[in-house]
Amino acid sequence: IMHGPIAAYRAMHELGVQDEDILNAMRYHTTGRVGMSRLEKIIYIADMIEPSRKFDGVEALRKVATEDLTKAMQACIYHSVKFLVDTKQAIYPLSIECYNHYLGEEY
């Protein structure tokens, strides 16, 4: 979880990146959050479905990612939270908020 905020910090302070949309996409690409920009959603989804991912259901996520950004976010955050619950891991508060937000979105 910490590599996102650390990468954003380093990009800003070492590389001079000042675009908040880019920095936020870096910060939240593993947790998600309420109010994500289009770029943040794309990076979040891309990280989850990148080619080296081999988990059950990744092909379905890849398919929906080519069809509908909102549905892809819903599916990805659901999969992420379900995985954490199933493996009895702590869930970052922003991820819970993001999940709850997408429960209210129309499918």
Predicted feature residues:
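Charged phosphate-binding loop/patch that engages nucleotide di/tri-phosphates or the phosphate backbone
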Residues: K82-Y107
